[in-house]
């Protein structure tokens, strides 16, 4: 009896769509779900497909060619551990488990270590692109044993999104948790992108009172230039979508932005690594403060502030906001990739930053034209400390920083909250400062806690008795 080439555990929408994606490339796929009904539903809805259902873990595992390749698409956390534990009694040494969930990278490091000790291969794999990407081609970020990756690479390359140059959006990221870490930072960058766009929207509404049709036209024009990206593209569509009553849908959506925690993970990791991930962290905080709707409504009746004054030069202001958005985006990516470098050093992953940018070019939520500029920057100088120092990005900063400053100044003077746009210029100015006022902070630390300090004019470590 012939055996299937790969198995998928978890028939929720992402697992189902990935199974269908794999099947569409000519593979036979064993499918299993903890609840029998879900498996039966998938099979009933996809008659004629090379999906073979199994209703016990043992039968599912035994249906696969060896070394077995099993893709887990189950709820991250305890659900993943439970699924792995159910599989292990039936696996042979050398079999490969691929975790495609939104898993915290430290969990992936642990599972890789534990399964390796038992002779199994474990590949923690970031998958970006949502439901449509899973079905038609996502961006895929696998990390784990390199030799195990080579055994699943043919399948992953066939199901991945394809960039304009024909290259699949998948590459080996690095050992143990590297793939899930890169996916985590991808999600953090996604948070930053979305908040920057939301602030541009607030500025255009507050400063120019643009109609939804005008906003859509503006974003359509932006999408034809430097800002060309998936998120700008969908935003132009969102502005003009109406509900069944003829109302613009975006105008009646409650202004509370939810989150699944991956942005928080990125910010927490930045603190662990000592990385100034200020813009992305502000985007996480912006979602948190948006959730304080009742408090904000009450505060709006108590706390005073300026009323936004209309801007005279409409075209000029739109261009300033566009430039501020693009430079803010560059700062966000500079912070994100700087954190990838710090993590690579900390966890010995030897990440290839140019390759990472390349696999973001299609399939994923942050896909954008300018990602090629990041790949180019690392091709020119693989050891560059920060993307802001690369010639292209330095030139953009030279040309666009005044617009960013003007937009932030307008927002502050007119009471429009722009936490990520503000964070962008604060980071830029801090990073370009040869001298910061941290000398005073270090003096304070030595004053109250004898934490010592270094001097600019002498070698060594010093402590002063400040009250003598």
From Swiss-Prot:
PROSITE patterns given in the database record: 6PGD (PS00461)
InterPro entries: 6-PGluconate_DH-like_C_sf (IPR008927), 6PGD_dom2 (IPR013328), 6PGDH_C (IPR006114), 6PGDH_Gnd/GntZ (IPR006113), 6PGDH_NADP-bd (IPR006115), 6PGdom_BS (IPR006184), NAD(P)-bd_dom_sf (IPR036291), Pgluconate_DH (IPR006183)
UniProt pathway: Carbohydrate degradation; pentose phosphate pathway; D-ribulose 5-phosphate from D-glucose 6-phosphate (oxidative stage): step 3/3
Binding site for NADP(+): 10-15, 33-35, 74-76, 102
Keywords: Gluconate utilization, NADP, Oxidoreductase, Pentose shunt
E.C. number: 1.1.1.44
Reaction catalysis annotation: 6-phospho-D-gluconate + NADP(+) = D-ribulose 5-phosphate + CO2 + NADPH
Gene Ontology terms describing biological process: D-gluconate metabolic process; organic acid catabolic process; pentose-phosphate shunt
Class of enzymatic activity (EC top level): oxidoreductase
UniProt keyword annotation of NADP present: yes
Annotated positions binding substrate: 102, 128-130, 186-187, 191, 260, 287, 445, 451
SUPFAM superfamilies: 6-phosphogluconate dehydrogenase C-terminal domain-like, NAD(P)-binding Rossmann-fold domains
Positions annotated as active site in the UniProt record: 183, 190
GO molecular function, a single term: phosphogluconate dehydrogenase (decarboxylating) activity
Family: Belongs to the 6-phosphogluconate dehydrogenase family.
Oligomer status and interactors: Homodimer.
NCBIfam families with a match to the protein in the record: gnd, PRK09287.1
PANTHER family found in the cross-reference section: 6-PHOSPHOGLUCONATE DEHYDROGENASE (PTHR11811)
Chain's role: Catalyzes the oxidative decarboxylation of 6-phosphogluconate to ribulose 5-phosphate and CO(2), with concomitant reduction of NADP to NADPH.
Protein name: 6-phosphogluconate dehydrogenase, decarboxylating
């Amino acid at each position: 009896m012939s055996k299937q080439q790969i198995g998928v555990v978890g028939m929720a929408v992402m697992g189902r769509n990935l199974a269908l994606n794999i099947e569409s490339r000519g593979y036979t796929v064993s499918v299993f779900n903890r609840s029998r009904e879900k498996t039966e539903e998938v099979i009933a809805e996809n008659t004629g497909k090379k999906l073979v259902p199994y209703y016990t873990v043992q039968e599912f595992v035994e249906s696969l060619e060896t070394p077995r390749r099993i893709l887990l698409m189950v709820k991250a956390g305890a659900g993943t551990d439970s699924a792995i534990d159910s599989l292990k009694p039936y696996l042979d040494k050398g079999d490969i488990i691929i975790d495609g969930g939104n898993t915290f990278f430290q969990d992936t490091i642990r599972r890789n270590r534990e399964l390796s000790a038992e002779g199994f291969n474990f590949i923690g794999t970031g998958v970006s692109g949502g439901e449509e990407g899973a079905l038609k081609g996502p961006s895929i970020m696998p990390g784990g044993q390199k030799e195990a990756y080579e055994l699943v690479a043919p399948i992953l390359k066939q199901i991945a999104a394809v960039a304009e140059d024909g290259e699949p959006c998948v590459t080996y990221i690095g050992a143990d948790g590297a793939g899930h870490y890169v996916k985590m930072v991808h999600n953090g960058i996604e948070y930053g992108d979305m908040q920057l766009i939301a602030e541009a929207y607030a500025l255009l509404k507050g400063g120019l009172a643009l109609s939804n049709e005008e906003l859509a036209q503006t974003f359509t024009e932006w999408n034809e230039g430097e800002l060309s990206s998936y998120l700008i593209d969908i935003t132009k569509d969102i502005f003009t979508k109406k509900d069944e009553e003829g109302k613009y849908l975006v105008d009646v959506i409650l202004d509370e932005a939810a989150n699944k925690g991956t942005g928080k993970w990125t910010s927490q990791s930045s603190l662990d690594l000592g990385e100034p991930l200020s813009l992305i962290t502000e985007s996480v905080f912006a979602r948190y403060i948006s959730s304080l709707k009742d408090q904000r409504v009450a505060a709006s009746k108590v706390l005073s502030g300026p009323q936004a004054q209309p801007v005279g030069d409409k075209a000029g202001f739109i261009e300033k906001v566009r430039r501020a958005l693009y430079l803010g985006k560059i700062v966000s990516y500079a912070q994100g990739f700087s954190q990838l470098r710090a993590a690579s050093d900390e966890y010995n992953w030897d990440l290839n930053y140019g390759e990472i940018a390349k696999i973001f070019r299609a399939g994923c939520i942050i896909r954008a034209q300018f990602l090629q500029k990041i790949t180019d920057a690392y091709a020119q100088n693989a050891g560059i400390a920060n993307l802001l120092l690369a010639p292209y990005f330095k030139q953009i900063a030279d040309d666009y920083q005044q617009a960013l400053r003007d937009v932030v100044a307008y927002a502050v003077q007119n009471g429009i909250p722009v936490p990520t746009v503000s964070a962008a210029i604060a980071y830029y100015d801090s990073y370009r400062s040869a001298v910061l006022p941290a000398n005073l902070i270090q003096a304070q630390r030595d004053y109250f806690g004898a934490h010592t300090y270094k001097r600019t004019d002498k070698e060594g470590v010093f402590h002063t008795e400040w009250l003598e």
